């Protein structure tokens, strides 16, 4: 019965920009391309669809607030959880992640995430990016060998025996792990843990990159940012003259500027016309993103004004995931693929995120500039009102960060 079912918590997605991390794939795990998997485009499309669906729900629940999340991190964590799901619980998770199960098999999805994780963790001189998964397991809880093997091989998961009966000690252990992995950026992911907890799954993404054309700190000045019609705040406003991908979308009423990192990954800044934010949010789809990316063209922006900001978030996603059709994991779940018995349910889904944007990128040193072309149209872009930001990895077309900055002065 429900009251007797054992609960466990799922900690989703720690996106931390502007910090250091030491996690990497285990050296003894060799990924072999022996299995059919979802092609990169299909995986990216499903992940993008889920990203916008998740963002819209968070934006509705947090009106007029900053919204910061790592949709890719949430996708990976839910896919990781689905390793242990069976029956309709499994179907709900995968369909909630926007996979068409009439065209894609479960094993293909897992192998696609395996290859995505391998690609994300490839070492690079120009980008610091790592993805980590960890399990904190009640000391006497016996996991199925198959689940342990798949967790390690497919999702590169670490495992730590934990005494959840001493819930405060367990909470400190997990929070300290997260704090260490995020160099102190996220200090308290869990504010409470039940002594009945059996298993905690943690996923995080760490991203650090430098602008290809950095802003000069000498040109950063205090300027007005219009939070709403009746509220204005003073923020440090960076400024730059550069050639960069640009698109004016008259149909949706917004201006797009793409700033490239030295790794050729990019941050897409989307500035809606005044009063158009909600209309624009409603039209966020994978097709819209594809149209935008295909429409971006190099343009000389004579004056780009962008606020410098550092913002954090901490969300409980239970209600939001239920809105997206993922309900059974919270009650009447079949997670028998974890222990062999269907006595586990998810009691709490937590997602923490943080992002720093400054003159050098997401913390780093100045990078090489790019050439500037002459143009007769003088373009000035002032990002001085609420805007959207998406950080996209070029090679995998993955949105690792998606958010809305309503007030840059709020951490």
From Swiss-Prot:
Site entry (Reactive bond), positions: 377-378
Location of the protein in the cell: Cytoplasmic vesicle, Secretory vesicle, Chromaffin granule; Secreted
Annotated signal peptide: 1-24
Key words of the record: Cytoplasmic vesicle, Glycoprotein, Protease inhibitor, Secreted, Serine protease inhibitor, Signal
GO cellular component: chromaffin granule; cytoplasmic vesicle; extracellular space
Role: Serine protease inhibitor.
Family to which this protein belongs: Belongs to the serpin family.
Protein name in the entry: Serpin A3-2
Species this chain originates from: Bos taurus (Bovine)
